[in-house]
Amino acid sequence: MNKYKKIKNNFDKEKKSYIVGFLFSLFLTIIPFFCTLNHLFSRKINFFVILLCALSQIIIHFIYFLHLDFSKKNSWNIISLLFILIIVFIIVFGSIWIMYNLNHHVIL
């Protein structure tokens, strides 16, 4: 197999991965819109449907667009992702904690 065919096969495989990821993402975006616009479920169930679709979409993006998997080759990428998630967790929940305490201690 010459170099051109190897590159073309790799490109076709990557293009297929992007198309599958896009279709999954599109499907996971349409489901919450359909459920909320047509009032299929109660508000609580709609919230959980939206949350489940959002978490599924995050996983789909990690797998199909960022190409993250648990192989030894990607171990540094996984470690970097975990570090970023910890930092985002600290920033978001720290901000919520600070705003709650500010709201609690404000004299009206």
Curated annotation (Swiss-Prot):
Coiled coil: none annotated. The chain crosses the membrane at residues 17-37, 47-67, 78-98. InterPro entries: Cyt_c_oxidase_su4_prok, Cyt_o_ubiqinol_oxidase_su4, Cytochrome_c_oxidase_bac_sub4. Cytochrome bo(3) ubiquinol terminal oxidase is the component of the aerobic respiratory chain of E.coli that predominates when cells are grown at high aeration. Has proton pump activity across the membrane in addition to electron transfer, pumping 2 protons/electron. Its main location: membrane. It is found in: Cell membrane. It comes from Buchnera aphidicola subsp. Schizaphis graminum (strain Sg). GO terms for biological process: aerobic electron transport chain; electron transport coupled proton transport. Heterooctamer of two A chains, two B chains, two C chains and two D chains. Residues 1-16, 68-77 are cytoplasmic. The keyword Membrane applies. It is a multi-pass membrane protein. GO terms for molecular function: cytochrome bo3 ubiquinol oxidase activity; proton transmembrane transporter activity. One of its GO terms (cellular component) is cytochrome o ubiquinol oxidase complex. Residues 38-46, 99-108 are extracellular. Keywords: Cell membrane, Electron transport, Membrane, Oxidoreductase, Transmembrane, Transmembrane helix, Transport. The lineage of its organism: Bacteria, Pseudomonadati, Pseudomonadota, Gammaproteobacteria, Enterobacterales. Belongs to the cytochrome c oxidase bacterial subunit 4 family. This is Cytochrome bo(3) ubiquinol oxidase subunit 4. Pfam families: COX4_pro. The keyword Membrane applies.
